[in-house]
Amino acid sequence: MSSIEQLYSTTQFPSLSSCNTNINNTNNNNNINNINNNTNINTGNLLKNTFFKNNIIYNTNNNSINNNSNNNIINNNNNNLLNSNNQNSFQNQNNLNSIHNHNNNNNNNNSNNNNTSNSENLDSLKSALLSSNIFNGSSSSIAHQNLINLIISSQNNNNNNGNSNSNTPDQKSTMADILLNSSVPDYFEWCSDIINMPKDGNEKSNNSNGGNNNGNNNGNNNNNHNNNNNNNSNNNNNNNSDSVPSPQNNYQSPQSDNQSSMVPSFNFSNQNSANSSNNNNNNNGSSNNNNNVRSEPTTPNDESNNNSNNTNNNNNNNNNNNNNQQQQLSSNQNSSPLIYSVPSYYVPNYGVVLSAPMKGNSSSSILPPQAWPQNNNNNNGNSNSNNGNNNASGFSDFMFNGSNIDYNSIMNNNNNNNNNNNNNNNNNNNNNNNSNNNNNNSNNNNGNNGGMFNGGFVNNNNHNNNNNNNNNNGNLNFHNFLQFQNQLQNSNQQQQQQQLQQQQQLQQHQQQQQQLQQQQLQQQFNIGKPCNINQKKGRGANNNNNNMPIGNQASLVISHPSLKMEGHHHLQQQQQQQHHHQHQQHQQNGNGNNTQIVNSAFLDLSSPDSHNQMSPSSPICLPESPMGAQHWESGLDPSSLQKQNEINPPISVRSNVVFFEPYLAGEPGRHKACWNLLEPMHRNYYQPIQFKLPSFPDTSLPITQIDDKTGIFDSQRFLAFNNPQAMSKYESYRIYIHPSLGYSGNAKRFKQQPDVNEKALILDGNVYDGHLNPIYNCKICTEYYQTKSYFSANPHAKGKVLLVKNNILTRVKDGGFTLSLKPMCCSGHNSHIPLYFHFTLTNPLTNEVVLQSLINVNVKQWKKSVPNKSKKQRFE
């Protein structure tokens, strides 16, 4: 934050309404507290009661001052105040202007005080300077030379019609000797020395004899020394010949917490044009303008253009009214207190938003700092870089000024107040092209005369022909601004593109992780499945033909665990289209021939969301599986059971207990026994089934002889095979249900998948009709469940022919376990032949099918309810 921003953010200004006496607040950090507003201010009292704390002036003098005091250094009879027009003398000043004493044109021959000689004034000043440490530091020699040049230049301007008491050359040399034997001033001691100058009762004012130069020399007042100006020397008592030299600008005053310092600048109430300028003959070209004096026009917005630079080259400087803010004062000159007007808005980063009427393009906004010109002023002599304190006088005048502000004056006042050597990093927009190569005061104003844009809303054509510094930087600044906008837009576009790329990469990474997780899950349920879709189609087309050797099928199953799943996504899309086409043919032909829709057996029923888009009245069209392959019963093809039944038909065993037998990898689908349940099952009803595991999983069932009468195999051998005392290999293993069969009902929180290295078995299976053709769905049952609004909580269960309850913890205990099965279709819908349920058990640790079982059961459509006794009595 710059100094002006810190000042505006921390300084609170009183809000008043009118002002009798102007205060030209041109310091970088303007902060005035309790300035005395008496009409006739005693200079001695003002300085005595003014103390400096952290470069902030505090005036504690609240007493009335005698209008006709003989001891006043300056006796202002007509509301004349001490015009301290050097706001920069306390912090990084360029023009080392000390206290400026301007004269009132109406004070002609109004002083009755006794006059003292210039020599007495010099003696008093000499004694004060010699008794104080005015200079101190390594840069004192430069400071000495600057002050000497200032004194010489100021004393060369005593051209006021013979009415001024100018110093003689001896007096000049005396002042030079005094200054060369001094050091850099300390403000407390320096001010106290000036205040405590020896005073006699005989000190009197040097009155002029009354001239006719009313306003003629108003533009020629020296900012450094007011030497008998305007024939009205009544205001410059004891200071007409040799005004007090100002402190050098290479002294940097201590900074306060608010980093603000200011010397109040007072104006005469009856003065029309008091715009003084430096008349240093050492300036190459136009000298620095007095940016600290306010003119008080008789009409509003009167631009006082009398601020000409009276040097050797006084060209093209007619509009140098920088910081010469016009203000129409109240007619009451003796009673109203000081008025401060605060700007309506303040933008910390970009400057002050002006609320007053502006000339030019008033709709233009202040540009950001990146678009401001970068003018590094190379200063000659004793200039100090005053970074951050650029808006000293312009904005301070604006803050203490009223309405009707000339925008050209304000915009050109920002950096022309004795801060002309500042290396402005942020606010270098409003410097003049009057690059005054003043080797002594280092006022190199290499700025932009046209404000922010040359020819824009500020048109102040102050060119110095002698210096040839017509730096029309407006177009360059506008080009820099456009370049800044383009860079900003390009950076924003690049950031947006990077964000999009990052989002895309993140989405791809998430998709890959999801696919990997689903792949790991799918591998647990794809044991023994062939991965070649063309092979599935070939076997599906030969459902009713047993021409394909079983050995070939076995080789396909054996090689499955080592196959990769690459390319399945593309093949699955083709297979899904064929399945949809074949499903339409199945609807047209009816349910009589189920072998025509073999490819629909590759539907993936493992995903819980696989049936969300399924319509009961339309064929089942399931979404793609994550692995790109359709699920079928683990370890089997849809035609495996039918082929093996024709080659090696199993032995039918009637029992209420179902035994698992070893899975033959070389002959998938081959069973030694088919377990016929003694009790029928009913559609849409749960029925518990008890399963047994062999004690020796690698040994086939000992079913070789069947009793013709009972139809039961040799029980003795079977009892020996199923020894209850022998511990099963899979004892205490947990049984998980494959998602293609599992149904949880209203239960939502239960474990569906085994953990890593967990001892578990996964149950998978499918339903076949009486001819061992797979059943995919039943149109009649589907429409029935739709009318009953079934599976509203579990839409993924719609269309399934068999459901197994999976929300109950099930483990192998004593060589067996029990599951609850619910058939969703009946035998009457499938040629009135009992249905076949086929199950497999897969070990997730080895990812291999280990056991299998085949069940034959009669499923009835309706279950007759038994009426209770009350109903029977009612019917009777």
Curated annotation (Swiss-Prot):
Q: In the record, what lineage is assigned to the organism producing the protein?
A: Eukaryota, Amoebozoa, Evosea, Eumycetozoa, Dictyostelia
Q: What induces it?
A: Up-regulated by P.aeruginosa, PAO1 strain and PA14 strain infection.
Q: Name one GO cellular component term.
A: nucleus
Instruction: Give one GO molecular function term.
Output: sequence-specific DNA binding
- Name this protein carries in UniProt: CAR1 transcription factor
Q: Where does the record place Low complexity bias?
A: 205-241, 265-292, 304-336, 375-391, 412-447, 455-478
Q: Which terms are listed as keywords in the entry?
A: Coiled coil, Developmental protein, DNA-binding, Nucleus, Transcription, Transcription regulation, Zinc
Asked whether the UniProt record includes Zinc among its keywords, one would answer yes
The record's note on what follows loss of this gene reads: Failure to develop under standard conditions and failure to induce expression of carA-1 and carA-2 early in development. Failure to sporulate, even under conditions that bypass the dependence on early cAMP signaling pathways. Do not form mature spores and all cells of the mutant spore mass are dark in phase with round or irregular shape. These cells are fragile and easily disrupted under a glass cover slip.
Please note every region of biased composition (Polar residues): 242-264, 293-303, 589-599, 607-618
**Coiled-coil segments:** 483-524
Instruction: Name one process (GO BP) from the record.
Output: positive regulation of sporulation
Where is the segment annotated Interaction with the carA promoter element?
654-870
UniProt subcellular location = Nucleus
Its annotated function is as follows: Nuclear transcription factor with zinc-dependent sequence binding specificity. Required for carA-1 and carA-2 expression in early development. Also required throughout later developmental stages - where it has a cell-autonomous role that is distinct from its capacity to control carA-1 and carA-2 expression. Required for terminal spore differentiation but not essential for cell differentiation and cell sorting. May function to help insulate distinct pathways from simultaneous and universal activation by cAMP.
Q: Which parts of the sequence are annotated with region: Disordered?
A: 76-120, 199-336, 360-395, 409-478, 530-552, 565-643
